[in-house]
Each structure stands twice: as structure tokens, then as C-alpha cells.
């Protein structure tokens, strides 16, 4: 077997991408005169942590012979005995031994699309924790399927196109029946990357009522949208979900942060056991190019939607070694190096996340899942030097079974222009959107981080992982990090504050979110808390700066990797569209599941430092902070 020789910036994926708020992905709609922020889903979720759950289930009767799905189903039935619901086909058991089961509430056989229930089952077969956003109001008595007094799906498509000013021509659209109840695919349209779709669903509104809507799906590249169009008035759009997460990154790369920190180095056979087919095969075909089971990387100078026939470097002997110079211009002159770097960073991050539990059953990005669960045929499509934009990057996360798509842009902030692919932090931040969207709410639901606060946490997780991965042996808790400084050509980076444990350097507190209205700003607050948490756990368990964690009984043995594991496990525990308080509780529950709460007080102290302590409360307009610790800490 020939070894894979990659010439790339070596360093643990380091930096995150920073992006000015004015240029995040949804601003593509803003440039069309539409403010997508005003269409975000309302936060409806509740979360019962493991302590509260233990008290609640004492009064419930569960059979020891039940499997974890049956136990979860009984809990939902006992909690909402008058509700109808279905089991979502994406349940799995995580590497921490917790089973995750997801449910969707229904009414008259139709989904209530933002009414979810997630149940987490412990190793002992008992309910560990759960969350839900089920509708508790009165279900409409009349079945809409009887009189069918709702609009045609084509009208809904046209309503979405008009309301959001989408570049989709729908004059000749015709609806063709698709799989699923009241589901359709539209023929005769142009402008979308794939045929638009629609299905009839109910939607919980902000005022607590239900609306019958057409959920219209349109992938227009920079935005991949689910638009909830009123089924009785196609001119009314209630809410919008965008699968694309964007960021104006200014970042860094794996051991190295950016080209200022070192030179390209050749690495042989860098894959881990997470990639049993290597990076250049999917177990069926061996590819002499930057394509494999986890990712397919190519250039995309036109910014188009196709990728299979786009240019990739070819190497029959799998030696991908190409020249690069910091003075080279334009970036297209080193596209082979750029594509190779993007392919390397994406695969390396895939393998790291796999070790933490983002595997096939959890909904990761792979073509061939090897009968290990989940849905395959969904590697990450990663475009280098994408011509659809500049000074930015984005990642679209459809549900498990459909490929994720990353677009990496060139940056015009310096002369010569800079290529975002050379900053691993940008790539890591974007790929983390795929991680969090697949875990939160389950692999089959990619709409669980689309409220303002949960969307902010989506940005914060990207910043956190990019920063955690870039730590160096010389770093201490007094080390500060900026985001996106190299790509932005600005040493201060692109966030409001540096990531720092010093409250004078970074004064963000939980209550700061009360005055913030943009997801990247809110994300900076969340990532600041996670940065504090990481250093608290490093002080408790020591730090290691190896590329991969060392596990003992499933627990990373150093504080840095332990934080990454707990934060990731928390994503799978928390409810759909969580708030800060619920996400904090989910991390505490993740520690209970993994270490029997060995780090409980350390975690509480880290969050309390910035006001997310015991007694902190969520309110969309008036969050209450607390620096207190719970009894026993």
C-alpha cells in the first residue's frame, strides 16, 4: 500500500474564524433586503437535568426488560398522556453509554415541526435526563386533511421566494408527490442548487398558538432554508431555519496556527482508527486525489453548485506535495496546496471528533458507515477558494444522510490576498457547525440551533473548539487568544474581546446577552465561558498538547480534551434549541454520565465566574445572573 504524503501546515487544528457580524451567511438575505434574524424560531425548550430527573422517575414504573427506546417512549407517554407523537429514526447509544432517543409531536398525523422531546437513557437502563418543547395548548379540533382548505404547495413556494427575495424562478413550478405525508418536490424551477421541496406541518408560534404551514426547503447556496409559509395565506412567513452557518473568519492551523507560525511539513499516513479505509478510500474505491470516505475537496472558482467534476490534484502514488509561498499571488497559483490543506484539516478534525463519540450512529459525515449505524452517503463537500464570496466561509448541515457543504473563501484583507484554507481555525469553526447541528436534537433534525440564543451557542462552540485545539505547551490560564487575526490581517482579531480568563481583558458576563442581538456576539459570550471551563479543568487534571486524547475507561486524562468531550456530550443531551442555562446543565449531566460528577464543583465554579452560576435564570429580555454555587460546592 502506498502511503499518503501530505504537504500541509502541521498543527493541531487551531484557530477559529472570525467574521464581522455584517457579513455572516444570513446576510446574503440581508443584501436582498431581508432580515432573516426576524424570522428565527422562538425558544420553547425545557430541560430536566439528571438530579431533577432522578426525583421525578421515582414515581414512575419502568420494566427492566424494556430496551432504551421503549423506556424513553414510556416517559413521553407518561409526561404527555394526551399527546400524539412519533419516534424519530435516529436513536443511538453514545460512547459515554448514554442512549439518545428523539420524538416529534404530531397532530392529525402531521408533525408539529418545532415540538421535540429528547430522552437520555443511562447505562442502568433508567431515564438519565430529558428535554422537550412539546406544544401544551389546544390542538385544533378539525382535521385539516378532511376539508383540505389549505393552499396549494406551489403557492407556498412562490410565497417563500417572494417574501425572502430568493433567486429562484418558480413561474413554471409544478408539485410532484414525494415520500412522506403531504410531501412534495417541485419540478420546473431554476435558481436553486437542488429541487425545492415542501411538506405540510404545524408550527408553534411565539404567541403559543399553532399554525398550519408549508415547510418549504430551498437550497440557494449561501442559504439553505426551511421557510414556514402559512398554509392559509401564502404571503405570510412565520419562521425561517437556515442550514448554513457562516462566519467571517480570521484564523489559524494543526500544531501551527497560521503561516506565520511555521512552514509546511510532510506527514505520512496521518489517519487514525476513525478512518479504517484511510483518507483516500471509501472502502469500495481508492481515489488518487483529495477524495475519500470523510470528505471530498476541490477548488470552486466560479462559486457554482457542482463539485464532482471540479478540479482536484491528482497523485496515483498518493503523494500530495505542492509548493506554497507567503508571497505567492493570486491564491489560484497554489490551489493544489490549498485543496490538500483543506482536505488534511477536515479529515484530521473528523478523526479527532470520532474519538470523542461523533461517530456513524451519532450522525457524522461519511460515505460508508460500515454497518455501524446512522445514514451514510454524506461526506463533507469542502470547496477551496470558492468564488461565491470573499472574507468569509460557511457550512451547510442538512440532516444525516445528506452531505454537508463547506465553502472556504479568499480574503482581500491583505496584499497578497490570503486563502482561508490555510487557517485551520476557520475550517474547524465551520466543521463544528456540522458537529453541533447533528448532535443537538438528533442527527435527523438540523433545525435545533436556529433560535437567537441557541444559534449564538452554535457560533460559540465553533470558536471554542478552534481555540482549544490551538493551545500550545507554553500556554497558561493567562494566555489570551484572538479569533481570525491572520485572515483578517488584524492582530486583534474579529471578536469584541479576546478569549481570556481575565475579566478585565474580557468582561463578558451571562447578562451581557441581554443587550446582544447577533449570533456571533452571543457566541463570543458562550465561548468565553467554555474557555474558562477548559482552563479550570486543565488546572484540575493537567494539560496535554498531543494531537489526540488518551482515554481511561472512556474518560480523557487531561483537562483540555476532557472539556472537549464534555462539551460535545452536552450537545447530545440538551433539548432542541437550548438556552445557556440548559446547555450548562447538559454539560454538568455529561460529567455525571462520564465521571460520576467528579468535576461537578469545578464546572459550577467556571460558569459562576461569568454569572451562569446556581440560580441564574433565562428570560429572553431579562436574564438573571448568579455567581453562586450549589450546596456542596
Swiss-Prot record:
Pfam families: FTP (PF07504), Peptidase_M36 (PF02128). GO terms for biological process: proteolysis. It is an enzyme of class 3 (hydrolase). Zn(2+) binds at residues 429, 433. It is found in: Secreted. Its main location: secreted. Residues 1-18 form the signal peptide. Residues 19-246 form a propeptide. Its cofactor is Zn(2+). InterPro entries: FTP_domain, Fungal_virulence_M36, Peptidase_M36, Peptidase_M4/M1_CTD_sf. Transmembrane segments: none annotated. Glycans are attached at residues 410, 480, 622. The active site is at residue 430. GO terms for cellular component: extracellular region. Secreted metalloproteinase probably acting as a virulence factor. This is Probable extracellular metalloproteinase 3. The gene is MEP3.
Amino acid at each position: 500500500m502506498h502511503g499518503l504524503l501530505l504537504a500541509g501546515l502541521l498543527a493541531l487544528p487551531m484557530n477559529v474564524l472570525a467574521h464581522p457580524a455584517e457579513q455572516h451567511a444570513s446576510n446574503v438575505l440581508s443584501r436582498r433586503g431581508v432580515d432573516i434574524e426576524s424570522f428565527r424560531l422562538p425558544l420553547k425548550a425545557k430541560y430536566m437535568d439528571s438530579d431533577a430527573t432522578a426525583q421525578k422517575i421515582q414515581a414512575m414504573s419502568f420494566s427492566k426488560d424494556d430496551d432504551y427506546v421503549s423506556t424513553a417512549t414510556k416517559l413521553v407517554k407518561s409526561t404527555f398522556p394526551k399527546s400524539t407523537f412519533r419516534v424519530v429514526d435516529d436513536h443511538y447509544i453514545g460512547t459515554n453509554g448514554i442512549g439518545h432517543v428523539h420524538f416529534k409531536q404530531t397532530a392529525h398525523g402531521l408533525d408539529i415541526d418545532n415540538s421535540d422531546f429528547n430522552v437520555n437513557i443511562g447505562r442502568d437502563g433508567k431515564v438519565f435526563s430529558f428535554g422537550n418543547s412539546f406544544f401544551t395548548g389546544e390542538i385544533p379540533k378539525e382535521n385539516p386533511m378532511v376539508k383540505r382548505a389549505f393552499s396549494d404547495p406551489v403557492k407556498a413556494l412562490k410565497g417563500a421566494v417572494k417574501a425572502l427575495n430568493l433567486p429562484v424562478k418558480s413561474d413554471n413550478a409544478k408539485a410532484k408527490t414525494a415520500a412522506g405525508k403531504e410531501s412534495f418536490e417541485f419540478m420546473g424551477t431554476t435558481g436553486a442548487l437542488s429541487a425545492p421541496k415542501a411538506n405540510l406541518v404545524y408550527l408553534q408560534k411565539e404567541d403559543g398558538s399553532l399554525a398550519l404551514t408549508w415547510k418549504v426547503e430551498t437550497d440557494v447556496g449561501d442559504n439553505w432554508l426551511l421557510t414556514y409559509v402559512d398554509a392559509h395565506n401564502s404571503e405570510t412567513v412565520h419562521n425561517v431555519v437556515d442550514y448554513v452557518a457562516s462566519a467571517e473568519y480570521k484564523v489559524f492551523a494543526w500544531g501551527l496556527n497560521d503561516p506565520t507560525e511555521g512552514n509546511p511539513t510532510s506527514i505520512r499516513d496521518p489517519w487514525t482508527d476513525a478512518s479504517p479505509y484511510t483518507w483516500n478510500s471509501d472502502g469500495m474505491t481508492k481515489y488518487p486525489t483529495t477524495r475519500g470516505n470523510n470528505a471530498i475537496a476541490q477548488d470552486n472558482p466560479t462559486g457554482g453548485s457542482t463539485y464532482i467534476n471540479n478540479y482536484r490534484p491528482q497523485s496515483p502514488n498518493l503523494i500530495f506535495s505542492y509548493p506554497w509561498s507567503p508571497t505567492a499571488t493570486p491564491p489560484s497559483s497554489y490551489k493544489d496546496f490549498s485543496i490538500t490543506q483543506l482536505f488534511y484539516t477536515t479529515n484530521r478534525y473528523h478523526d479527532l471528533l470520532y474519538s470523542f463519540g461523533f461517530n456513524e450512529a451519532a450522525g457524522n459525515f461519511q460515505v460508508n458507515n460500515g454497518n455501524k449505524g446512522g445514514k451514510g452517503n454524506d461526506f463533507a463537500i469542502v470547496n477551496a477558494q470558492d468564488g461565491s464570496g470573499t472574507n468569509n466561509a460557511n457550512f451547510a448541515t442538512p440532516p444525516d444522510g445528506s452531505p454537508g457543504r463547506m465553502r472556504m473563501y479568499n480574503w482581500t484583507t491583505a496584499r497578497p490576498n490570503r486563502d482561508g484554507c490555510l487557517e485551520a481555525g476557520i475550517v474547524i469553526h465551520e466543521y463544528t457547525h456540522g458537529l453541533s447541528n447533528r448532535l443537538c436534537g438528533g442527527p435527523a433534525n438540523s433545525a435545533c440551533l436556529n433560535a437567537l440564543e441557541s444559534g449564538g451557542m452554535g457560533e460559540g462552540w465553533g470558536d471554542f473548539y478552534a481555540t482549544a485545539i490551538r493551545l500550545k505547551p507554553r500556554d497558561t490560564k493567562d494566555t489570551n487568544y484572538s479569533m481570525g487575526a491572520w485572515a483578517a490581517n488584524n492582530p486583534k482579531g474579529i471578536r469584541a474581546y479576546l478569549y481570556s480568563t481575565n475579566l478585565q481583558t474580557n468582561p463578558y458576563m451571562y447578562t451581557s446577552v441581554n443587550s446582544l442581538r447577533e449570533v456571533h456576539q452571543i457566541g463570543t459570550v458562550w465561548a468565553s465561558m467554555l474557555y474558562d471551563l477548559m482552563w479550570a479543568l486543565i488546572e484540575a487534571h493537567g494539560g496535554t498538547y498531543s494531537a489526540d486524547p488518551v482515554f481511561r475507561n472512556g474518560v480523557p486524562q487531561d483537562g483540555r480534551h476532557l472539556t472537549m468531550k464534555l462539551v460535545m456530550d452536552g450537545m447530545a443531551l440538551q433539548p432542541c434549541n437550548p438556552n445557556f442555562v440548559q446547555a450548562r446543565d447538559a454539560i454538568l449531566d455529561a460529567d455525571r454520565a462520564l465521571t460520576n460528577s467528579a468535576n461537578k464543583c469545578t464546572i459550577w465554579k467556571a460558569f459562576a465566574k461569568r454569572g451562569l452560576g446556581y440560580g441564574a435564570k433565562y428570560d429572553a429580555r431579562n436574564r438573571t445572573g448568579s455567581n453562586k454555587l450549589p450546596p456542596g460546592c
